[in-house]
Amino acid sequence: MTISPPESGEKNKKVLEDPVKADPRPIDFAKLDKPGFWSTKLSKGPKTTTWIWNLHADAHDFDVHTGDAEEATRKIFSAHFGHLAIIFIWMSAAFFHGARFSNYTGWLADPTNVKPGAQQVWAVVGQEMLNGNLGADYNGIQISSGIFHMWRAWGITNESELMALAIGAVIMAALMLHGGIYHYHKAAPKLEWFQNIESMLNHHIAGLVGLGSLAWAGHCIHIGAPTAALLDAIDAGSPLVINGQKIATIADMPMPHQLCDPQIIGQIFPGLASGVGNFFSLNWFAFSDFLTFKGGLNPVTGSLWMTDIAHHHLAFGVIAIIGGHLYRTNYGIGSSMKEILEAHQGDPILFPAPKGHQGLFEFMAESRHAQLSVNLACLGSLSILISHHMYAMPPYPYIATDYMTVLGLFTHHMWIGALFIVGAGAHAGIAMVRDYDPAKHIDNVLDRILKARDALISHLNWVCMWLGFHSFGLYIHNDTMRALGRPQDMFSDNAIQLQPIFAQWVQSIQASAVGTSILAGTPEGLPQKALSEVFNGSLVEVGGKVAISPIQLGTADLMIHHIHAFQIHVTVLILLKGVLYARSSRLIPDKASLGFRFPCDGPGRGGTCQVSSWDHVFLALFWMYNCISIVIFHFSWKMQSDVWGLTGGNFSQSAITINGWLRDFLWAQSSQVLTSYGEAISMYGLMFLGAHFIWAFSLMFLFSGRGYWQELFESIVWAHNKLKVAPTIQPRALSITQGRAVGVAHFLLGGIATTWAFFHARLFGLG
């Protein structure tokens, strides 16, 4: 920790004393009638059909609107409020549907037999077929978002609470919209305020994350945990008694405000009624009934203990509040990000960068694309971590036995994470083209990496080839041996074993930690329940269904794991090449002057098409799609086979050949979606078909060249001219970049929606 010099303190003081500019841009509704008002070229209106494409491409590219960093940053800040408003409206709609149309209370009363339903479909021309029997006399559309399980964890027990939340969310949406307008038109922050990094870290880490987590811990302690205790007791068949009344049904539950009464709450958690005296006298053991470290899963609900979750959020909130105060803001004490960065020098032998991290602070503070790139990479990785924790440590009651919800949440968080990581590559490329000044980065680590880019990319290329040939070669070998009737020569758990010994070692290390006192800090050591059951734990059943069990790994897992590794490395190769060669390459030394996206590099330099940083993102999206498809296929089949007991444990012997994947996974498990017509899941059959069409539509844009379409349009325009019905807006074929963008968008949408229908019909169809 260091004391900042007086002039630095003064500078910070000025920023925080006068952080905003009043009335920088009066509200002008007339602009809304003029599409493309932010561009002199587009605001003139369309002459060709290219206008509509440029309108879409540049509407959110704030850099090109004004070229002013302060103005662009204000727009981003204002857009955040708009984004939050949309989220609140979306949440309000979910709450409203839950309150008015769903079977939430029916599910809450019998969560192991009743299925979650969103609404009942009106009978217009036979649509009532979609209303499946979900139990408890409710016919409607089954959902798999996990929203019911989440509401139960929050402590919501009736429709009026959901309606109150719906109204509250709409009010919050209005406040957010007002905030966006206010902070752009009436009181817009100055550029210095946005670039006051330490204050931003203080506000985000201590304020938003720390206090937010602490506030949520308060809700979990006072509402969530007591409600969970009462509901769990009902579901276990041994209801609790409050004030002499047995809480036997949902109707008997106390209202949330009643749970804040010490006299009532003391009958559930005596520690909650003991007052704050124990806190200030450091007798924190008195709170151990509602702030627990039980570990493992609640045997009634198959989910983490609500009191453990409350304890987690309390601890995390305190850590974040302390962590948010590590940085130097008003008082001259604390760490400076610039000083921390510049104190790190490159290794003189392994990574010679004489100027170390000099210039990096300014680049990260001033480049919005660089910031977004790092944030997307971190958040994407976090989303992928979440997807794995959702099944290994199920947080919400009864979610672990709702198999479609488990699979849906895994798939959702994998797609989101992967898209964010590709976005990180995209914005890193934009940052290199638009925000990177080579003169300010001589002999620092960024410059050093750019100088070493040929070695980095060629080595990564070699790794990809090695992984690809070897991992795919194992499958080719197995398919060949099976076709020749030589099972003894196959790679399998029964013949030539390729056991994932490192993964098994990681699993056993987790299990071997049980009983050690070093990690737990207690004489009796780390309890068995402190580990996820997937690490050599025990099977947990809820309502006759497997909630979680140990996940054994074998040859089939090692083989598909190396396919995952291959695809991840190729995706990274493409993205990294797009970033490192965004400004220049041997083929096109002046890429930086051509911009982030350009189709071809003009006449005279043949073979220079499709080399822009944008084109690398385009290609990476296909590899990302294939990569995540195999990941979710692996998860779906592995869980159905080895955990949920739906396919008779066929994964280990069928997943070791390509034919096995095609026959026993794709073909065998698609029977539900292909035979869904006439059933409640028939919409997934239609979605499966329609999404295939969307996917096939994309190939029209990806396989054909721009010239083909332009010639087609010209002949159609000629025919119109002959009939004197020529349009005033001249038809133009999409540019190469536009065509590729339309192609990849439909490819991803079609592919993802096809998988969506396949998964849902499979698990809903099995009941």
UniProtKB/Swiss-Prot annotation:
The PsaA/B heterodimer binds the P700 divinyl chlorophyll special pair and subsequent electron acceptors. PSI consists of a core antenna complex that captures photons, and an electron transfer chain that converts photonic excitation into a charge separation. The cyanobacterial PSI reaction center is composed of one copy each of PsaA,B,C,D,E,F,I,J,K,L,M and X, and forms trimeric complexes. The chain crosses the membrane at residues 76-99, 162-185, 201-225, 309-327, 368-391, 407-433, 455-477, 558-576, 616-637, 681-703, 741-761. One of its GO terms (molecular function) is 4 iron, 4 sulfur cluster binding. The gene is psaA. InterPro entries: PSI_PsaA (IPR006243), PSI_PsaA/B (IPR001280), PSI_PsaA/B_CS (IPR020586), PSI_PsaA/B_sf (IPR036408). The keyword Thylakoid applies. Belongs to the PsaA/PsaB family. This is Photosystem I P700 chlorophyll a apoprotein A1. Divinylchlorophyll a' binds at residue 692.
